[in-house]
């Protein structure tokens, strides 16, 4: 049976909106994915029936909110394939998760210890480590990127040494769509005792994960990219590692006991969840992950791969256009960046907006990668399972119109 | 909205790229970056007796940014520093606050009228002017 994209689209109310009198062809999913009605209903129902502060309230609403929040933690654990929900720390998103690690894990590092990043990282997986370098004198090393927009894993042996403490890489590039061969990274990390953190912002939206099988130590992702609300995300860490880390933010809830002289801290995950957390957002993100877990990802992936191929062929048919990333479907997702010489990405996006097509243009918070390809920016189309042939065709038609009008 | 934005005169202005390049030293220079998109404009110029004697721009930007840089390249040489400051301020007000563009400003600026409705693109037009003002700070640090 073929993938029923029409019934999937019907679950996303925004896709039937007509802003400016045109249908929406939403291909900016790598920035923010749309959210299904079930998630909107869950958040609305929670706020209407179960709103209260969590953990310390001795009343029915507080208990209901606490239960919903803790159940959400369990749903995140299931989505990531991990058995222990206490290994899930709710965060404000991927950036907040990496900053948490840069402080907490960073506090365990010494002057001269090394962290390996890559040239294709999002700024959120670069700047927090640069700030740590300024605070504590750690050394950053860099994996290069191949002409195809993939991590050059052949360089791992050169970049990893006895002082390497952490390897922090994108699971999937938000520019090139290339998926990292995590097995090779983990294999290279283990002999020197380095930990591996994956920025899963772009991979997490494309189906449930099995983190124990991946063999990594930390994983971060964002709720708004997995069809859930803004302002929420999660950090997963192996229990033994999270337990060994000091807290990052101080405040209510993250303590065991507070006294004038010193304070002691709560067990994981609460140690890392200071203050009142975004409760409804956590509940909403869990609803989004349950929605995702109910999807047939084998069919959904076949569908998005077919659309990706259609998009790649369409872009390649436009004279002079260059794909920044893998040209084929192997080891990539439907995040497709391209350069059209003489046309600026923002002008392209503006023209495409006139066709009802939502794209993203610019450096995508990856200026080091842009330098690698000698570009100021690219135009990016990114695909979700609810996209269809009409979205891709509108995009290609719009790109041809942009060439006609701007070149 | 988009149909209006990239009209023929504006595209032609951007492609004309008047005075693209670099003024040979000795020159004043100013640079402006848009961190949202990575666009960058560098203005180099010479000033004599309170007027811009020579000016050139290196522009890595979108069509709106290129067109604004070309307008500067076409009209700023020969203009007084005071006039340039005034035009930049009036352009900013016209784009962002809906004021009128007074008679006597550079005629090319009226071609940016459709941009007023697209807030996210105002800074594309203003970036070359920011670089120009930056360059002039060396002689007029207002």
Regions found by a protein language model. Give the residues of each.
Chain B
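C-terminal binding/interaction regions
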Residues: 1-21, 79-142
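Alpha-helical support elements that line or immediately flank enzyme active sites
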Residues: 68-80
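Functionally engaged cysteine thiol sites
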Residues: 37, 62, 124
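Structured beta-strand/loop patches that form or line metal/cofactor-binding pockets in enzymes
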Residues: 16-59
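Short, thiol/selenol-centered motifs that function as redox-active sites or metal-ligating centers
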Residues: 59-66
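Short capping/connector residues at structural and topological boundaries
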Residues: 28, 41, 57, 69, ...
